[in-house]
């Protein structure tokens, strides 16, 4: 089940929500374990886990086979994260990859491989060097997504 680690108020310090987020995710994980379900945390923009470091903190603190990563290249780029650094932090937790690319500060996504997501290099690493056997999803968002806009 793809899921997220809670929207954080726009002007708030995400780190101040660490304990609350961990407590809520532990509740989700208990339910997932009971039903033998894997929760896939996506690094969506604006949530607690939208940076590589906070995603790593979640996986380290919650260490559980029922809680894995859905790695979204574009979301990391749009959060001004280096995808290669994020991959290095998270590769052992990744079970699902979203093929979607972006340019920093750019509201629209761009075709895969044309942004700063380093998609070709990181997929080559995943499959050829690390033996990745998880899922891939082509997620070609090329229009403005403003579903959550006021």
Positions of PLM-derived features:
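Active-site acidic/histidine proton-transfer and metal-coordination neighborhood
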Residues: 1-69, 78-80
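Histidine-acidic metal/acid-base catalytic patches
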Residues: 30, 51-71, 76-150
């Amino acid at each position: 089940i793809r899921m997220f680690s809670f929207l954080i108020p726009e002007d708030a310090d995400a780190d101040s929500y660490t304990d609350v987020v961990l407590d809520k995710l532990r509740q989700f994980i208990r339910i997932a374990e009971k039903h033998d379900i894997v929760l896939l945390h996506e690094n969506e923009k604006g949530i607690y886990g939208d940076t590589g470091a906070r995603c790593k903190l979640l996986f380290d603190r919650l260490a559980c086979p029922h809680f894995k990563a859905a790695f979204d290249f574009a979301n990391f780029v749009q959060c001004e994260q280096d995808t290669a650094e994020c991959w290095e932090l998270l590769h052992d937790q990744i079970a699902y990859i979203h093929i979607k690319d972006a340019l920093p500060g750019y509201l629209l996504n761009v075709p895969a491989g044309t942004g700063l997501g380093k998609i070709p290099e990181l997929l080559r690493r995943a499959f050829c060097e690390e033996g990745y056997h998880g899922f891939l999803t082509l997620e070609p968002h090329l229009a403005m997504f403003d579903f959550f806009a006021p």
